[in-house]
Amino acid sequence: MAPPPLPLFSPSLKAPPPPPWLHGSSTQSRDSAPPVPPLPAEATPSKFRIDSPKPAPARKNTKTAAKPLTAGVPGGRTHRAVLGIIRRVRSLELSDAPSPNSVHTSNSGAAAAAFHLTIELSPPREPGQYVVEKEKSRAVPWAAARDEGLKVALRREKKPREPTRAETELETHELRRLRRLARGIGRWARAKKAGVTDEVVKEVRREWASGEELAAVRIVEPLRRSMDRAREILEIKTGGLVVWTKGDMHFVYRGSKYQQNAKHSHTFLTNVHKDDAFQENDQSICGQKDEEPVKGTLYEREVNRLLDTLGPRFVDWWWDTPLPVDADLLPEFVPGSKTPYRLCPPGVRPTLADEELTYLRKLARLLPTHFALGRNTRLQGLAAAILKLWEKSLIAKIAVKIGIQNTNNEQMAWNLKHLTGGTVILRNKDFIILYRGKDFLPGGVAQTVIQREAQVHDEQVKEEEARLKAVDSLQMVGELSEESSLGTFREYQGFHAKFVHENTENSNTMIELEAEKYRLEKELKDHEWKLSVLNKKIERSNQALAKLHSSWSPSEQSADREHLTEEEKIMFRRIGRKMDGLVLLGRRGIFDGVIEEIHQHWKHKEVVKVITKQNQTRQIMYAASLLEVETGGILIAVEKLTTSHAIILYRGKNYRRPAKSSFSNLLTKREALRRSIEVQRRGSMKYFVRERQKSILELKRKLRYVTRQIRYRTP
């Protein structure tokens, strides 16, 4: 249970007396304390000061006003919660009983180091005394400075940047000299979409051979997305050091030990050492590298170890590590390769449902890329690597290389699907994602299942041979009678008369007619069922429209109408045609918002022009008459425009703006939209009902014709 509230202004157990100005003319306060002169209004805290009847206007800039420590935080703790925290902190401070020495020394200056929390408490009030508080007023002039010291700014901790190879290997003055030299370079090699290719490496070395210490390389998409990865690739392939990066430019230093006439080997472009191309994070159990820290998480090390077993890595990968396997370096043909054996578990549907497909696509988004592919055919080596990967992972994620000509992701996906038997769950210009399928069997399990099925087949063959031998060994109990027709010509004649028609052409025609009759009957039944479904939908739509129409009651036209002369109608018609302001009658039709907008136009103008996109004359005239009745105006004309019609309405000479702004007898905007959707839906369903009825009549006609043909050919 929390301790009772204690004053937080002093570390002593005895509460200090309240300020004398809070007790007014009390005798007890005069006896207990000497008279204190009243404080000026500027020094009196706003919490304790009685404001004048006309308070000063509040400042507009409330950002500089100091808030008390116990004020509620928007979206955080409330005032009561902060008070509870302070009580607990205060109880911890008072839990240790102070010794006499400590109390004595506290008066000499140690009390300044005690833990104090300033909190604004409501002062005690006497009967008849009231305090007028301002909501957004500062407490005292020094409150802002006092609260400023209590604020604690927690900055986001920045991740320390790892130094580059050039920063660790070169001296500081040498690095500065090279960067100053790089600012004057005007030529550069361009690493295109294919990345840092052999041509780029040759151009960099050609620049070094000409006597230059630095060579500039401009990086383009997609390698520009990760300039750190581009720097690593350049340092691996060229053997130099990237001393400076500016925008999309890398400046490569040839090194202090560069030999101009040395022959450089290009074998590392296809077989890069593992320590340079990617970091192998697993440690030796024997203890040779115990002093080196383990880099990367367990998942990253397992992924790297798995990809190492599949093939060489793709060094020009434009994303972060782990580097995918270069599928173009895998063998094109594998001897004895074939589509793997598959077997779906009993009671499991082999196809994927929509929810499963969505889940697999979301799962593939987080997985690293396993392969990078740049050719369309000869993918047997890649298929074998995918089958090996599927033993550890459900999904194989393949990236299509950028910058290689004649790549066709559709052909790649088709070949991989037929070589592996998997399911393509995603295919676009960047990625191909293959799911191993529910019927996938790992290599060892597949061989076991095949062997077991072969054993079962052999046992069945042996059982059949044994059964045939037993049947042959049995002797017939009775001989065939002389009157038997088995195997005789009479048996052949009876079979021919019973089952074979005399006219073969006629029998084939009858079979075709029977098949056509069966097809027509089935199709007619399907059409009738679909027609019944459409009729039920139309009935539900009619019920929804009836419910909407029940909440709408059109107004009655007034009997006392104004009459305009022909000259006035012609004048208002010209004015309406030249007007720029208009009211657009959309798909919702006429609802309360349209009537309100018309009255807003009539507030300043006598004529309003309403534009409607309807095509049928009956609908246009109905809308014009309904607007005339609901607004109380006078219909001047209905004009034909280029792609629409204009309805011109005059407000009348005795026009008065309606008292109420909402029209309860009309539909709201939301109800009008629902009505429009239901009307459009019902119209489309009626169209399909007519088309379905025509199809049913045509099928019945064909069925009658086929039935007559069968009846005519039947003997």
From Swiss-Prot:
GO terms for cellular component: chloroplast stroma; ribonucleoprotein complex. The lineage of its organism: Eukaryota, Viridiplantae, Streptophyta, Embryophyta, Tracheophyta. Its main location: plastid. Keywords: Chloroplast, Coiled coil, mRNA processing, mRNA splicing, Plastid, Repeat, Ribonucleoprotein, RNA-binding, Transit peptide, Translation regulation. Residues 1-76 are annotated as: Disordered. Gene3D superfamilies: YhbY-like. The keyword Magnesium does not apply. PROSITE patterns: CRM. Residues 448-473, 502-550 form a coiled coil. Optimum temperature is 25-30 degrees Celsius. One of its GO terms (molecular function) is mRNA binding. SUPFAM superfamilies: YhbY-like. Pfam families: CRS1_YhbY (PF01985). GO terms for biological process: Group II intron splicing; mRNA processing; regulation of translation. Required for the splicing of group IIA introns in chloroplasts, and especially for atpF, by regulating the intron folding. Forms splicing particles with RNA. Also involved in chloroplast protein translation. The keyword Iron-sulfur does not apply. It comes from the Eukaryota. It is found in: Plastid, Chloroplast stroma. This is Chloroplastic group IIA intron splicing facilitator CRS1, chloroplastic. Residues 168-265, 350-447, 562-662 form the CRM domain. Residues 1-21 have a biased composition (Pro residues). Residues 1-40 form a transit peptide. Optimum pH is 7-7.5. PANTHER family: CHLOROPLASTIC GROUP IIA INTRON SPLICING FACILITATOR CRS1, CHLOROPLASTIC, CRS1 / YHBY (CRM) DOMAIN-CONTAINING PROTEIN. More expressed in leaves than in roots. Homodimer. Interacts with RNA, specifically with atpF intron. Part of large ribonucleo-protein complexes that include group IIA introns and CRS1.
